[in-house]
Curated annotation (Swiss-Prot):
It catalyses: a 2,3-saturated acyl-[ACP] + NAD(+) = a (2E)-enoyl-[ACP] + NADH + H(+). This is Enoyl-[acyl-carrier-protein] reductase [NADH]. Belongs to the TER reductase family. PANTHER family: ENOYL-[ACYL-CARRIER-PROTEIN] REDUCTASE [NADH]. Keywords: Fatty acid biosynthesis, Fatty acid metabolism, Lipid biosynthesis, Lipid metabolism, NAD, Oxidoreductase. One of its GO terms (biological process) is fatty acid biosynthetic process.
Length: 400
């Protein structure tokens, strides 16, 4: 079929398999160009490996460190009549390129919150890898099915205490609007912590540890975003922030356990990037369009892949073997460039003056839109979008 982009709200409802493959290859080439990480991980589990920072982590491990990787995700394959999700095509492309380079690559498609996913991963690790030396936790899901009761819990992207009103961009109509978000109830805050907090990360590590598949010295990392006062009401000081604070709690508990065998657990605080997850958060698209323009001008811009390559090479797996630099909460900070005072001051000054008319001139909004479509495989250089493509792409994946 010939596939064109169709957007609804903050998602694109179509995806392009060839475009997604080209995106993955671009990230692989970026990683290979950095050169190998001398003392990187060799057997890696990535939970949430099909897009964004999780996909970049899998690429960094495999193509930067020559690691065998096992990826866990929840994606839909394409059918004769309908394309699959971008994450399905990303994972298929990763698998193809990893195998072409002689690297071990297997994937599990199913609910990562379930007991079954954990057991499937353990069985594969025992059969194929023995033990793993790195676990990346990168789930971004709006809903979690509790593994014991089967109850569905939903997260909320809401402020706490009072209604949040701010200038934002309507990405469907390309208009500057004023948006208001009602505050979260106590229940909504609790539910957001249940879905997006650290509990499932702990459950994964407990299951892996009990099964004896964690090697001595195993490192685990989960991803967070803090931002600044520009986004704090909706993010760090909102319901989502409470969940990310719970990730800090989990990291501390996990670090205490893993350090007894020479391992570690850290939250890595990353910069804002264009992902399906960030596009759903009010004000983030406008903030990203502003901050990207300034960071590009300063030569500081990074996408997911550049961020994760820096985390591997300059934080977790330093050439000198030294422990990574952390903040006072033991977090790895990769948002250091974004948080530079001159970058943030620029955004603070610019925010009130952005209008629908000057949006594309004052910010990188057009680039934001391009990058958003690219997540789904569209607008990728060198791809013929008038060509007939097969939406059914299969690869080495266990489904349940």
């Amino acid at each position: 079929m010939i596939i064109k982009p169709k957007t609804r709200g903050f998602i694109c409802t179509t995806t392009h398999p060839v475009g997604c493959e080209a995106n993955v290859l671009e990230q692989i080439n970026t990683t290979k160009a950095k050169g190998p990480i001398t003392n990187g991980p060799k057997k890696v589990l990535v939970i949430g490996s099909s897009s964004g920072y999780g996909l970049s982590s899998r690429i960094a491990a495999a193509f930067g460190s020559g690691a065998a990787t096992l990826g866990v995700f929840f994606e839909k394959p394409g059918t004769e009549k309908k394309p699959g999700t971008a994450g399905w095509y990303n994972s298929a492309a990763f698998d193809k390129f990893a195998k072409a380079d002689g690297l071990y690559s297997k994937s599990i498609n199913g609910d990562a919150f379930s007991h079954e996913a954990k057991q499937k991963a353990i069985d594969l690790i025992k059969a194929d890898l023995g033990q793993i030396d790195m676990v990346v936790y990168s789930l971004a899901s709006p809903v979690r099915k509790l593994p014991d009761s089967g109850e569905l819990i939903r997260s909320s992207l809401k402020p706490i205490g009072e209604t949040y009103t701010a200038t934002a961009v309507d990405t469907n109509k390309d208009l500057i609007i004023e948006t208001s978000v009602e505050p979260a109830s106590e229940q909504e805050i609790q539910d957001t912590v249940t879905v997006m907090g650290g509990e499932d990360w702990e459950l994964w590590l407990a299951a892996l540890s009990d099964a004896g598949v964690l090697a001595d010295g195993c490192k685990t990392v989960a991803y967070s975003y803090i931002g600044t006062e520009l986004t704090w009401p909706i993010y760090w000081h909102g319901a989502l922030g409470k969940a990310k604070m719970d990730l800090d709690r989990a990291a501390k508990a996990l670090d205490e356990k893993l350090s007894t065998t020479g391992g570690s657990a850290n939250v890595a605080v990353l910069k804002s990037v264009v992902t399906q997850a960030s596009s759903a958060i009010p004000v983030m698209p406008l903030y990203i369009a502003m901050v990207f323009k300034k960071m590009r001008e300063e030569g500081l811009h990074e996408g997911c892949m550049e961020q994760i390559n820096r985390m591997f090479a300059e934080r977790l797996y330093r050439e000198d073997g030294q422990a990574p630099q952390v903040d006072d909460a033991n977090r790895l900070r990769l948002d250091d460039w974004e948080l530079r005072e001159e970058i943030q001051q620029h955004c603070r000054d610019l925010w009130p003056s952005v209008t629908t008319e000057n949006l594309s001139e004052l910010t990188d909004y057009r680039e934001y839109k391009d990058e958003f479509l690219k997540l789904f495989g569209f607008g990728v250089e060198g791809v013929d979008y008038d060509a007939d493509v097969n939406p059914e792409v299969n690869f080495d994946v266990e489904q349940f």
